[in-house]
Amino acid sequence: MNSAHQIIRVLSIASAITFFMIGWPIAMATSAEGLKVSLSDDQEVPPVSTSASGNGTITVSPNKSVTGNITVSGMEPTAAHIHEAAQGENGPVIIPLTKGSDTTWSVPAGAKLTDAQYKSYLAGNLYVNVHSAAHKGGEIRAQLSPK
């Protein structure tokens, strides 16, 4: 009877050690973390001259779902999007943001990246920008660069 308890105890300890050595790092690597973004005119391509600015948080989860919002000031935005392109380049819209007020925009519920878009995100090749009537191609921008 004493041997059975020792075997159970050893197996329990071995299971716990296995989780912390293997499972815990995997769980930590797959957790989503919000990216703080700071949008500015000098990140646009080509750069523009404006006093507008913006900030917010965009979260991309390992299941490829996207959430977040941005707030802008010093401009009258007409549209906001997440695009796919490297820093210094322009790219196609992949997620149109939803206007919440004159100064806030949010990622729509259920937004999700494709496998290829998620790889681009991991490589730092997604960006968010906000358009205006004065700057139809974009007035302020921030690259989404995961840590």
Language-model regions, residue ranges each:
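Metal-centered catalytic cores of metalloenzymes
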Residues: N2-H5, I22-A80, E84-K147
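Bacterial N-terminal signal peptides
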Residues: S12-W24
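Bacterial N-terminal signal peptides that target proteins for export
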Residues: N2-S15
